[in-house]
Amino acid sequence: MIRPSAFSYEDLLQCGRGEMFGPGNAQLPMPPMLMFDRITYISDEGGAFGKGEINAEMEIKPDSWFFNCHFPSDPVMPGCLGLDAMWQLLGFYLAWRGGPGHGRALGSGEVKFTGQVTPKNKLVTYHINLKRVIMRKLVMGIADGIMAVDGREIYLAKDLRVGLFVSTDSF
């Protein structure tokens, strides 16, 4: 089966509605929690570790919901939203690879924030490098992620972990 290597905003919304990977399988969050506008490239080959990679983008709009509340007089995108975007992308990757179940973030190793996103910025880019992919009874991905704003790397997350679970009753 040939899988698409890029996804539009409409494709991502389809995934959020549960229409992409089938009932009971991974979904992306819907806006405003969907933290990217498109996946520009996804592959199960290549990347820094030869296990696959994902690239995605989000255009920054000065009226984005998070700027109004974080913080009204000093608007900045919360760092946790960038981190969540990386988990979202890793979960999407596992579903794209055919893994069944609902995605859940399981943690990360080192996380560094060395910059910020403000209403003056234009474009956030994400690059996820898969380190390990387990596609057995346990479906889990481990990856390193980088977030950049207007070409400058500002977030680094090592050992991001996401699993897919057929049942989340005991979670």
UniProtKB/Swiss-Prot annotation:
Keywords: Cytoplasm, Fatty acid biosynthesis, Fatty acid metabolism, Isomerase, Lipid biosynthesis, Lipid metabolism, Lyase. Its main location: cytoplasm. SUPFAM superfamilies: Thioesterase/thiol ester dehydrase-isomerase. CDD domains: FabA. It is found in: Cytoplasm. The active site is at H70. Its EC number is 4.2.1.59, 5.3.3.14. Pathway: Lipid metabolism; fatty acid biosynthesis. GO terms for cellular component: cytoplasm. GO terms for molecular function: (3R)-hydroxyacyl-[acyl-carrier-protein] dehydratase activity; trans-2-decenoyl-acyl-carrier-protein isomerase activity. It catalyses: a (3R)-hydroxyacyl-[ACP] = a (2E)-enoyl-[ACP] + H2O; (3R)-hydroxydecanoyl-[ACP] = (2E)-decenoyl-[ACP] + H2O; (2E)-decenoyl-[ACP] = (3Z)-decenoyl-[ACP]. InterPro entries: FabA, FabA_FabZ, HotDog_dom_sf. GO terms for biological process: unsaturated fatty acid biosynthetic process. Homodimer. Necessary for the introduction of cis unsaturation into fatty acids. Catalyzes the dehydration of (3R)-3-hydroxydecanoyl-ACP to E-(2)-decenoyl-ACP and then its isomerization to Z-(3)-decenoyl-ACP. Can catalyze the dehydratase reaction for beta-hydroxyacyl-ACPs with saturated chain lengths up to 16:0, being most active on intermediate chain length. PANTHER family: 3-HYDROXYACYL-[ACYL-CARRIER-PROTEIN] DEHYDRATASE, 3-HYDROXYDECANOYL-[ACYL-CARRIER-PROTEIN] DEHYDRATASE. Belongs to the thioester dehydratase family. FabA subfamily. NCBIfam families: fabA, PRK05174.1. This is 3-hydroxydecanoyl-[acyl-carrier-protein] dehydratase. It comes from Nitrosococcus oceani (strain ATCC 19707 / BCRC 17464 / JCM 30415 / NCIMB 11848 / C-107). The lineage of its organism: Bacteria, Pseudomonadati, Pseudomonadota, Gammaproteobacteria, Chromatiales.
